[in-house]
Amino acid sequence: MIARGVRRLLRARGFSSVTELALADGRRADIAAVNGDGEVLIVEIKSSPTDFRADRKWRDYAACCDRLYFAISEHTPVDVMPLEAGLIVADPYGAEIVREAELTFVTKPTLC
């Protein structure tokens, strides 16, 4: 249900998004989004600190997007999420960016 709230937020910010986008390396981004300027975002959804700790692939996603975010529920501790990515707190009805992701690319990435 986190994905639904995140996608509503992205749509309100002018992004079109899809879930489970297959990247060229075979991995799947939980949410990938693009806006009219061609800015590409990837949002990885984490349901718990354990889910995050088990994920070793998230750093590789930065090469596939302009900005990388994690999305968590309000029940997931914020302090376990890395500072290298933006942070979105979401529920089924909406979401809020609590930490903006830094721009990772000056030139446009390809979807790996």
Question: Which residues fall in each region the model found?
Answer:
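Non-catalytic C-terminal interaction segments of nucleic acid-processing enzymes
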Residues: 1-25, 80-112
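Catalytic cores of nucleic-acid endonucleases
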Residues: 46-92
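Flexible, charged surface loops at secondary-structure boundaries
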Residues: 10-11, 35-36, 62-64
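Amphipathic coiled-coil/heptad-repeat helices and related helical stalk/stem segments
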Residues: 2, 27, 53-57
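Short, Lys/Arg-enriched charge-dense amphipathic segments
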Residues: 38-48, 97-100
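Short glycine-rich, polar/acidic loop-and-turn segments at beta strand-coil junctions
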Residues: 21, 33-35, 46-47, 74
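Active-site beta-strand-loop-beta-strand hairpin of nuclease catalytic cores
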Residues: 25, 29-42
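Short coil/turn segments at beta-strand junctions that form active-site/ligand-binding loops
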Residues: 15, 39, 66
